[in-house]
């Protein structure tokens, strides 16, 4: 898989090359290219934004910069039809575990990181003539820009690519993998600061352990995310 990120803060995306994601790059499972949007500006101030039509607060990122940037970045791929353009925005559809699972099968994803009041909508309308475009939100809150959302989403779907995790069963038992939250986890020692590991986990009875985990998962989901239950 190839990942491209267009941003005015390339340094923000350095964590993409660290830890598990860095190992995926080393294994050749993914490649990452980060592009500085200001490379496509033509004025001495390298301006990427302008006042919004219709008035209002803030600034809007210019199509005359974003358009050429995406033209060049998309052209660098093996074929536009295999590319997914993702726009992180609080006005987008919710990013979920199902989204992550779907994206893990993509050949190429390009992220367009907005700032200020966002990017001129015509940029995405134009791009949609050539590639698939998804505007996606990671939650009902507003960030300063799209970069943090890119880091969150990338970690969520890259870990699902076969070969990235040492144990593929790890993500199969995650929260949301079966529509429920994952229950509590424990490791050695069996007693710590007067707190004991639930005896069933020490029993060696796999059926009882599985039943206990299911019960804990249902209980936690009911308490914290009842909206996930039927």
Curated annotation (Swiss-Prot):
S-adenosyl-L-methionine binds at residues 114, 138-143. GO terms for cellular component: cytosol. This is tRNA (guanine-N(1)-)-methyltransferase. Homodimer. Its main location: cytoplasm. Belongs to the RNA methyltransferase TrmD family. The keyword Magnesium does not apply. Specifically methylates guanosine-37 in various tRNAs. Signal peptide: none annotated. GO terms for biological process: tRNA N1-guanine methylation. It comes from Rhodococcus jostii (strain RHA1). It comes from the Bacteria. It holds the Pfam family tRNA_m1G_MT. It is found in: Cytoplasm. Its EC number is 2.1.1.228. One of its GO terms (molecular function) is tRNA (guanine(37)-N1)-methyltransferase activity. InterPro entries: Alpha/beta_knot_MTases (IPR029028), tRNA_m1G_MeTrfase_C_sf (IPR023148), tRNA_m1G_MeTrfase_TrmD (IPR002649), tRNA_m1G_MTases_N (IPR029026), tRNA_MeTrfase_TRMD/TRM10 (IPR016009). It is an enzyme of class 2 (transferase).
């Amino acid at each position: 898989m190839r990942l491209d990120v267009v941003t005015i803060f390339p340094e923000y995306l350095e964590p993409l090359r660290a830890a598990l994601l860095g190992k995926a790059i080393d294994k050749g499972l993914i490649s990452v290219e980060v592009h500085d949007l200001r490379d496509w500006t033509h004025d001495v101030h390298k301006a990427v934004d302008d006042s919004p039509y219709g008035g209002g607060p803030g600034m809007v990122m210019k199509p005359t910069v974003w358009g050429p940037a995406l033209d060049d970045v998309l052209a660098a791929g093996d074929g536009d039809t295999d590319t997914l353009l993702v726009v992180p925005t609080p006005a987008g559809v919710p990013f979920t575990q199902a989204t992550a699972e779907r994206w893990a099968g993509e050949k190429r994803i390009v992220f367009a990181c907005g700032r200020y009041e966002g990017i001129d909508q015509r940029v995405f309308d134009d791009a949609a003539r050539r590639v698939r475009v998804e505007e996606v939100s990671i939650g009902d809150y507003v960030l300063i820009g799209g970069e943090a959302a890119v880091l969150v989403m990338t970690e969520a779907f890259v870990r699902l690519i076969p070969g990235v995790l040492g144990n593929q069963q790890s993500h199969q038992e995650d929260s949301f993998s079966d529509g429920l939250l994952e229950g509590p986890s424990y490791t050695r020692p069996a007693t710590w600061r007067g707190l004991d590991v639930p005896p069933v986990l020490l029993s060696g009875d796999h059926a009882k352990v599985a039943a206990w985990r299911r019960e804990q998962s249902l209980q936690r989901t009911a308490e914290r995310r009842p909206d996930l239950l039927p």
